Every structure is written in structure tokens, then in C-alpha cells.
Amino acid sequence: MTIRKLCAALFCACTVLGLVACGGGKTPPAGTGNMTEGSDVTTRSEETTSAETVSIEEGTTDTALDTVAEDTTEAETVVKDPHPTAKLNLVMAHDQMAERLVIYDMDAYAEGKTLDDLELWSVPTGHAAGLKYRENSVFGDVIVVAGSHSAIYAYPSGEELWGTDQPGDNPHSVELLPSGNLVIASSTGNTLRLFATSALLEGKVGTANRYTDYALTDAHGVLWDPEREVLWALGSHELKAYRLEGEGKRETLAEIPDMIYSLPEGKYWGHDLSPDYTDTRYLYITVGACVLRFDKETGAFSEDFSHADVLNRTNIKGFSNNPGGSFFASGETGGAGTDWTDWWKASWCTDSIYYAYNDEAEGFRVVKLASSESAFYKIRAFCGRYQ
């Protein structure tokens, strides 16, 4: 039996029995935190080295992590092309209005087309913010999301392999580590939350729900770097790197003191963290004022990068390029181009996505595509590579 089928069978069995477990336990690194039995963490230290572990005994259950909402499990996964990975210019976006994740085929773009015309694949996810496609040795091809319902979805079937509900912490970003463990960055919770999801490989569903929290103020972004073997994490005022310690379900994070970088003055409130798929030396970071490119070798931030003159805008929540050099960005927030009256839609979402690419006839071109019935937050190039 493949790990995907095993995970799906275990999750479905637990859902039928109403036994979606909460918690689980790794012992936190010495001096980094306290273990809490069977409950969510209620207090968090602002010290950047702190960690807290939530734990229950093997085989016991707790319903604090809610089961998947009926409206998401019963909705249909739409697949127009089950294997679009050969296509280059695909972009993922989460539509917070429709509560679904959508893949758009930008190679099908032509004058007069809207985003709706380019839709290739979708899956119902609930209200989510962070999203990534990963080709993982443990789970296979999957899409991971972070939000009111954070989950691992098999791709292209859309089948949920694992999920948890923790909306109060306001999850913003997610990363699936090579080990199969999952990290979720939560802004209100001010944490990086490391779930032991690799335990699903051993058939231990309860253990997979165990997590350890690591404090990071207003955590918004998280990204694994296979070249440097560190986990990058973005908060409101700084970018940090963590190394992984331990293996499998006992894996932990350790902050690297000499890899903490303060964001430039006046360029605070990090929103998005993504790789530069054309050069592993760099990362892209969005803040309220602009888009920054971070140099891993020098530790410097810059607003100058390829085509920055047309791409660098304010109030961009999501920004990503792909290996072919195309760029994708969510449209400006603040109600630009919309007639929304609900404040949340105009504050952090947009109805449009920028697609920037090299046109053989016209050179580098930027088009803005909209879907009037959508509300996008973060977007991401559909690429299974970490960088």
C-alpha cells in the first residue's frame, strides 16, 4: 500500500469514528519550553528561542482539533487536466470568497480572457491563506495549505491526507519538510508550529497531530532551503533561519543566532516569503511598502531586481516567480479595482493577479487578470521544488 493510500485510509477511518486526535508529544529542547498535557498552549513567551509542546498519550484522543467541515469534504474537486505539471506558467491562488484553491494556466492567456477562462484545477479547502505544491518523498505529490483548516491534499486527486482546525491562531503560511513533517506560521499565535505529520508513515494518526510551538512575532512566511539546509521564517520585523534537529516524528527546530536579519527601516510587516526560482542565492519578501529581494550570501535586502520597475508595487500580499523567469503577484489590496464594501475583502484580498512574462513579439509584458467573484490573498507559482 502506498503512503498516500495508507494516509487516506487512516484519516477516513478516524473521521468515521469521530476520533481525530489532538496533541502529541516530543520533549522540547532543554531550556526552550514546557510540555502541556492534552490542551492547546495558552501562553507564549516572546523570547525567540522558546518552544512549547502539546502532548497526549499514544492511543488517546481529543476533539480539540476539529474534523473537516462538511462543506469542504462534500464539495467537488474540479480537474480539467489531471497532469498539468509539464506546463510551465501555472499559478496557484486561494480564493477566500469561494473557500477553494485554484490553479490557473497562464499559458492559455489571450487578449480578452479572464482568470475564470484560465482555470485548470481546484479543490475546496475552507478559509486558507498559505499554499504550496510539493513533490515529497513521504507523501508524494501534494498541495499543503494553512488556514482555518490546514491540510495536506493529494495531487491531483484532491483527497485530504491529513488536516487540523486551528483558526484562532490565524495561520498564514505552510511548509512541508523533506521529512514529511509540517510547519505552519501563524500571525496571531506568533508561532511556528511544527506538526509530527511524518508519523503517518508509521500509521500513527494521533502522533501526527502532535505539535511544538516556536515563538516568532507575527509569523507570516516559512520556506525550506535544501541548499543551506535551513528553514527560513518571516515575521513582522525580521527574517530568521532555523536548522532541523532530530529525525522523523522527533524532529525539532533550532534557531540560528547568526542568521537573524532585521527588515530595512520603514519596510516592516512581512507578508510573503518565496524563493527566486532562477537563482538559489535569493529570496523574495513582500512587505506593506514594497517587494524586497534578500541576498542569502550577504544578508542584504534590496528593492532592485529583474523588472522591478514594473513589478515592485505597494500592498502586494503574494509574489512569486517560476524557473522560466515569469512572475506572478496578487493585485494591490485596499479595494483597488473592486466594488467590495466588506472591509476584510478590501483590506487584505484582491480580485486580480498580475502575470508578467516575456512575449516574443512585445518583450517583457505585465497583464492584470481579474475574477470579479474572487478574493485572493497569497498566490504561488505551481512548482514542486523548494527553490
Locate predicted features:
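Repeated scaffold domains used in trafficking and secretory/extracellular systems
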Residues: G126-S137, G168-L177, L216-L223, E265-D276, ...
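Bacterial lipoprotein signal-peptidase II cleavage site
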Residues: G23-T32
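Conserved beta-strand positions in repeat-built beta-propeller and related beta-rich domains
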Residues: M92-M97, V142-S148, I184-T188, L231-H237, ...
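Short loop/turn segments immediately following beta-strands, especially the blade-tip
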Residues: D105-E111, A196-K204, R243-E251, D295-E303
